[in-house]
A protein has these predicted regions:
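Short alpha-helix capping/helix-loop boundary micro-motifs
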Residues: 1-7
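Short solvent-exposed strand/turn elements
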Residues: 64-73
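Short coil-to-beta-strand transition motifs
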Residues: 42-52
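Short, Lys/Arg- and Gly-enriched loop/turn segments at beta-strand edges
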Residues: 24-36
Length: 73
């Protein structure tokens, strides 16, 4: 799962991060705590069960920083 991060250095590859879930009327979104990065929106079928993940990549692009996490599900 990919998250958008606004500033560099808030998480590192290999770090275990806590995730919180937000609910919209027809989808869910996830935040790396404490409000470090936010995911896009996911449908019910894509909903995460895990609340901890491991950072496997941090990529800098012209649009910002993108954090990729893996979850044991």
């Amino acid at each position: 799962m990919q998250f958008k991060m606004e500033r560099p250095g808030q998480v590192e590859v290999g770090q275990i991060v806590d995730i919180t879930e937000g609910k919209l009327p027809s989808s869910f979104y996830y935040t790396i705590e404490p409000a470090v990065a936010m995911s896009g929106n996911y449908r019910l079928a894509e909903r995460l069960i895990a609340r901890q993940g491991k950072v496997i990549d941090v990529e800098e692009t012209p649009r910002g920083f993108f954090v990729t996490c893996e979850f044991n599900e």
